[in-house]
Every structure is written in structure tokens, then in C-alpha cells.
Amino acid sequence: VPKTIDNDLPLPEDITTFGFETAREVGTKLVMNLKKDAFTSRNWFLVMSMGRKAGHLALGIGKSAMATVTLIPEEWPGGNIRLQHVVDILVMTVLLRLLEGKNYGVALLAEGILENLDEQDLLALDNLKRDEHGHIRLADVNFLDILKKAMETDLAGLGLQMRMVKQV
């Protein structure tokens, strides 16, 4: 039985891998709860899901829970993601929500965003360590903290202040 929560094995189009549906279902419930929390507390939640090489799980959760925005590494062909581009997308999402009168939301990101950051952006990160296979030790990088601070700085430059909470 093919087993991976990433759903990244070459199976027929309508066949998901063992474990993917369970992970998507649990993740969906969590994000739906965070959406309720975001609404009642008027906060933005930044959420990171598993998916170092593929954003299938994040996309599945984001679509099922109707997250405000879902970012997956596949959106950047070539795997050269600039940190500021990610921040710009998130800040623009916040601004668009404000135009709708909503100062809250849930931003869901696949951990592959960090894995595919531009080399210059990676070098600027604190605590960047790699394992014996050359993969970034994702747990050692406080990526959501980095995004949160960058978003707060950009929003402050626009005269806005938002409460943001990070979740992993």
C-alpha cells in the first residue's frame, strides 16, 4: 500500500495515498477551528503544514477549510522563492481583507516554501542548519516568526497594525 501524507506518488489521478486523507481531514478541522478563533479574536493566524517537497497536503487542507490564503511551493516554478515575495502576497491578502471589512484570517503555508527560498534569503536566516542529506532542518528555523515580523513591519509602514498569531 503506498503510504505518504504528501500524496506525491505517481498514482492514477483519483487515487490518494494512504494517510493523505486522514492528514487532510485532521488539518482541515484544525484550520476551521483557527478560522473561528480568527473571527472571534480579530487575529490573523499564520499556519505551517507538512509538505517539504509537495504542497498537496497544504492545498487539500486550504481548499477543504477555505483558508483565507494558501501558499504552496509549486506556485513558484523553478523553486526560487524570494522571502519578500511571500511577505508581499500575505500583506496584500491582509489589505484585501481589510477592504472587505475583515481584519482577520488564516494564512496556510506548506513547509516547502522555506525549503525553496532563494539562497540569499536562506543565508540571512538565523539558526539555518542542514541534515546529513542537505535538507534544511525546518524545526530549527522559526519561519513563521520571520514572516510575522516582516508582515508587521510592512503593515506598520502602511500605518496599519494587525495582531498575528503563529501556529505550526
Language-model segments: residues:
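Accessory alpha-helical/coil subdomains and C-terminal extensions
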Residues: 12, 16-166
